[in-house]
Amino acid sequence: MASSVGNVADSTGLAELAHREYQAGDFEAAERHCMQLWRQEPDNTGVLLLLSSIHFQCRRLDRSAHFSTLAIKQNPLLAEAYSNLGNVYKERGQLQEAIEHYRHALRLKPDFIDGYINLAAALVAAGDMEGAVQAYVSALQYNPDLYCVRSDLGNLLKALGRLEEAKACYLKAIETQPNFAVAWSNLGCVFNAQGEIWLAIHHFEKAVTLDPNFLDAYINLGNVLKEARIFDRAVAAYLRALSLSPNHAVVHGNLACVYYEQGLIDLAIDTYRRAIELQPHFPDAYCNLANALKEKGSVAEAEDCYNTALRLCPTHADSLNNLANIKREQGNIEEAVRLYRKALEVFPEFAAAHSNLASVLQQQGKLQEALMHYKEAIRISPTFADAYSNMGNTLKEMQDVQGALQCYTRAIQINPAFADAHSNLASIHKDSGNIPEAIASYRTALKLKPDFPDAYCNLAHCLQIVCDWTDYDERMKKLVSIVAEQLEKNRLPSVHPHHSMLYPLSHGFRKAIAERHGNLCLDKINVLHKPPYEHPKDLKLSDGRLRVGYVSSDFGNHPTSHLMQSIPGMHNPDKFEVFCYALSPDDGTNFRVKVMAEANHFIDLSQIPCNGKAADRIHQDGIHILVNMNGYTKGARNELFALRPAPIQAMWLGYPGTSGALFMDYIITDQETSPAEVAEQYSEKLAYMPHTFFIGDHANMFPHLKKKAVIDFKSNGHIYDNRIVLNGIDLKAFLDSLPDVKIVKMKCPDGGDNADTTNTALNMPVIPMNTIAEAVIEMINRGQIQITINGFSISNGLATTQINNKAATGEEVPRTIIVTTRSQYGLPEDAIVYCNFNQLYKIDPSTLQMGANILKRVPNSVLWLLRFPAVGEPNIQQYAQNMGLPQNRIIFSPVAPKEEHVRRGQLADVCLDTPLCNGHTTGMDVLWAGTPMVTMPGETLASRVAASQLTCLGCLELIAKSRQEYEDIAVKLGTDLEYLKKIRGKVWKQRISSPLFNTKQYTMELERLYLQMWEHYAAGNKPDHMIKPVEVTESA
């Protein structure tokens, strides 16, 4: 604030002396000499103005006003006196009076520069920014070379956000006075605000070069270097500032922040403590000290520091947010939410708090509200990469894959070194089947952040999917060690429960992984504060019927529906009332239509996204037994089961493992799949089906495969049943229309050990190689879709989608006679064809080695695999060549529509099951095609399903107890053709006569198990193992 001291004329030099003393700050001496002069010249207004200014500087406002008033009395037109009086009013907070006096001074003296400067300051204090700008502009109109005033105008424009105008002011000030360090520093601030970091650094460095003692410029330089993450130079700038002002607490705090970013946590902690020592009421320093303590693992002390910061400043938003983070990590979700909301109440534009709150809301299943807060975070901070990445996670959970992809991509554009975003993007690629892209993104994430368990374990799974076994053993060891450490520290393991079966983990680890995911569901439902449901103790309200609820996201075109779609309609309506709860929208397929039509009640819970309300609906339906068909597969909503809307809850069919969850009572399984001696692997009680827990609806979906005919393909005197095969509903009528059809009897053993096979021969229709057979073969060779023979439509087995797409998907039964040949798939006519139609991730190095050993022992044999995925093919071929197999010994085919997939299984001689994780649905598919399957049960549920299927089928001779026995069984089938024919005949016969595909008998056995569960519960008992199943027959 400029005081006007006037001009004092005194021949004695007394006035000149008083002026020098005033300028030097020696106000006491200046006042003494002014008073002496005033007594000599009472009418000297210059002396009065100087006295007014002296008293103002000494904060003696009343005396200052007194002398200004005396000067005005002496000269009412004295502008300087009015300006000095305005200064007094401004200092007292009487802004309007101050402004009026400044304006009066300017009316008296329009070129009064100090008057404009003082008026500008008062207008700023009064909030009239535009008026202040005009005051500075007026001053500069009278003297354009006032570089300090122009710099002050620049500061005001900068504060108003008018950065370009501010920049012009600073540049003009520098042009006027190139060595004006303040303008260089202020210009650096503008460039920093505009994101021009390097220009900002340049201008701050120029400022300190011009003025090596310019404290603020060193602080600004340190700040911008810190933001640019040029930490060594930032440290140097802050240390220089501290050499100028050793007790500057804020600089100590900023320097500590740089040490923290450099990972020098102990040094950061010491420096924060020094800042607090210098300024005990420094909430920012307490908050940042807490951050460093938390990083070091001193969580309790960190929590104390956050609380201290909040005691000093209850509205300290950063401390509220960071304390909320601690509460969240401690599992105190409600307190975390309260603190996040408080932080936003204090500071609504707090982007990080919006993002953190959104993350917790997402964890609670409140996805729409989470999405809203992520959008707010991004609105406030458009370059908030974390918010984009986390919003992508929410959109992914909401099944908006494209939206998630865009979010992750934007996060990476903002911050190319953002490892989490690369990992999240990889997961989108992985879920979309773009495995090479996923692998590349996971590897980028790990380069950026080598200690990144989620990225490592997901990369391991991707490499498993494409059979990339580089450093396989080391990878498995590291993966196991990661899981061990995470379980020890009570963290959510990076291996998903559904993938745990693929790795050499202990049973305890697999169960613990599932348990952690089950606990996540409990965390989500705890926030709902729903009181426990009251459950029925009897069947009175349901007219004596047991109400069973099947919950699945797979009621549609999905392998689970292919297996069980007939069961809801086969329940005894007198004893059971069936509810099907869909977790996914209608996909428009006949699979969905069938379940909807045949269940007593079909409820689409995908339209009730709130888990609490969905569970209420299930409870209102009075369900007695609620069946979980998803486990931890895609689309699951285990939170519904965590709320326990039914008294009995059971796992069944859709998930090959334990839930690890206390809210699941039973797992429906069988003695072969889950032997009683390994019951500790399961959190649930074992509930045994009498034969196998697995079932397939193949007899209903593919009845045209119950019979087949072959075209006479002779080699070495044998008639082969799988070179050129015809199937169809009207097959018998078609064969009756043909001349010379032969019936060849194929001997096969029965389901037991009966050596007399004469009574179990199967009749195989054989069409001789005549003009009709040649027409069929020509259709195949020429790639025709369909021909007509004797009024029957004969179709190319590769063209089912072109003839009837619903038949191709298995939704309808094909109405034509379908021809399937080895030549269609490039399979050798005269070779033994081993097959496996599983996804390639189920093959591990030891499995491929067994396959290679078998092929080497069986001359003229091949292994038929699927491009599932296609990118796995070159890896398998390369490893096979390394094992000594020529490339032509392994043949790949594309994945086919469901009906073709099942039907073409007839062309193989033997299926080699994958011991790591069996073919479950694919096992049923290949057995329905009549092809024997060799398996070797392991220790996990997923590795024992095929043995269960074969046991039910009565084909124990195909179950190996060791790798050597597995190879020997496969080799015998490939070298002893008579034995192969017998086993193929047995499988062909047993698939019809055994319980394996008998859905009606299976449903009755399942009902018996449900009644056991209910009777046990109704008697007041807790769930217990049910390992002595009651067998029923179809006539029962």
Curated annotation (Swiss-Prot):
It catalyses: L-seryl-[protein] + UDP-N-acetyl-alpha-D-glucosamine = 3-O-(N-acetyl-beta-D-glucosaminyl)-L-seryl-[protein] + UDP + H(+); L-threonyl-[protein] + UDP-N-acetyl-alpha-D-glucosamine = 3-O-(N-acetyl-beta-D-glucosaminyl)-L-threonyl-[protein] + UDP + H(+). Several different immunologically-related forms of this protein are found in different tissues (with apparent molecular weights of 110, 80 and 78 kDa); they are probably the result of alternative splicing and/or proteolysis. O-glycosylated; contains O-GlcNAc. Both p110 and p78 forms are O-glycosylated. The modification N-acetylalanine is found at residue 2. Optimum pH is 6.0. TPR repeats lie at residues 11-44, 79-112, 113-146, 147-180, 181-214, 215-248, 249-282, 283-316, 317-350, 351-384, 385-418, 419-452, 453-463. Changing residue 991 to A: No effect on phosphatidylinisitol binding. One of its GO terms (biological process) is positive regulation of transcription by RNA polymerase II. The modification Phosphotyrosine is found at residue 979. Residues 981-1000 are annotated as: Required for phosphatidylinositol 3,4,5-triphosphate binding. Disulfide bonds: none annotated. Keywords: Acetylation, Biological rhythms, Cell membrane, Cell projection, Chromatin regulator, Cytoplasm, Glycoprotein, Glycosyltransferase, Lipid-binding, Membrane, Mitochondrion, Nucleus, Phosphoprotein, Repeat, TPR repeat, Transferase, Ubl conjugation. GO terms for cellular component: cell projection; cerebellar granule cell to Purkinje cell synapse; cytosol; euchromatin; GABA-ergic synapse; glutamatergic synapse; histone acetyltransferase complex; mitochondrial membrane. Expressed in brain, heart, liver, thymus, muscle, lung, spleen, uterus and ovary; in the kidney only an immunologically-related 78 kDa band is present, which is also present in liver and muscle. In the pancreas, expressed in both exocrine acinar cells and in endocrine cells of the islets of Langerhans. It is found in: Cytoplasm; Nucleus; Cell membrane; Mitochondrion membrane. The active site is at 498 (proton acceptor). Inhibited by UDP, UTP and UDP-GlcNAc; 50 mM NaCl or KCl inhibit activity about 70%. Belongs to the glycosyltransferase 41 family. O-GlcNAc transferase subfamily. The TPR repeat domain is required for substrate binding and oligomerization. Monomer; may exist in different oligomerization states in cells. Homotrimer, oligomerizes via TPR repeats 6 and 7. Trimerization is not necessary for activity in vitro, however it increases affinity for UDP-GlcNAc. A heterotrimer consisting of two 110 kDa subunits and one highly related 78 kDa subunit is isolated from liver. Component of a THAP1/THAP3-HCFC1-OGT complex. Component of the NSL complex at least composed of MOF/KAT8, KANSL1, KANSL2, KANSL3, MCRS1, PHF20, OGT1/OGT, WDR5 and HCFC1. Found in a complex with KIF5B, RHOT1, RHOT2 and TRAK1. This is UDP-N-acetylglucosamine--peptide N-acetylglucosaminyltransferase 110 kDa subunit.
